[in-house]
C-alpha cells in the first residue's frame, strides 16, 4: 500500500481493508464510497476475530481434549497462536489505515 497522502493511496487502502473483511463486504457500495466507514467496520471485524481466536485458545483443551489426539491438540494450539499473532498485526495496521483516512499522521516513536 502506498504511503498515506500520496496520490491515489485510498484505492489500494480500500482493497487492503476489503481483503481483511468477509468477502460479502465487497458487494456493499457504501464501503467503497466511504473508505473511512470501511476502515471503521474493518477494525471492529478484525477485533472480533482476534477475540474469537483468544477464546478458542483458552477453551481448546477443555472442548477438544477428549476428541483429538495430544499431537493434534498441540498443532491446533500452535495454529490458533499463529492466527492470533496475524490478527494482532492486522488489527494494528487497520487502525493505522483508519487514522490515516481521518487525516491523522503516523509519527514513529524513537
Go through each PLM region and give its residues.
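Eukaryotic low-complexity, intrinsically disordered regulatory segments enriched in serine, proline
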Residues: 6-110
Amino acid at each position: 500500500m502506498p504511503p498515506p497522502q500520496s496520490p491515489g493511496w485510498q484505492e489500494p487502502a480500500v482493497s487492503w481493508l476489503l481483503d481483511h473483511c468477509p468477502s460479502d463486504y465487497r458487494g456493499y457500495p457504501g464501503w467503497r464510497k466511504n473508505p473511512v466507514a470501511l476502515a471503521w467496520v474493518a477494525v471492529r471485524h478484525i477485533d472480533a476475530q482476534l477475540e474469537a481466536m483468544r477464546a478458542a485458545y483458552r477453551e481448546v483443551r477443555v472442548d477438544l481434549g477428549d476428541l483429538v489426539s495430544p499431537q493434534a491438540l498441540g498443532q491446533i494450539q500452535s495454529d490458533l497462536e499463529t492466527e492470533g499473532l496475524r490478527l494482532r498485526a492486522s488489527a494494528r495496521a487497520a487502525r493505522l489505515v483508519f487514522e490515516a483516512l481521518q487525516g491523522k499522521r503516523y509519527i514513529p516513536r524513537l
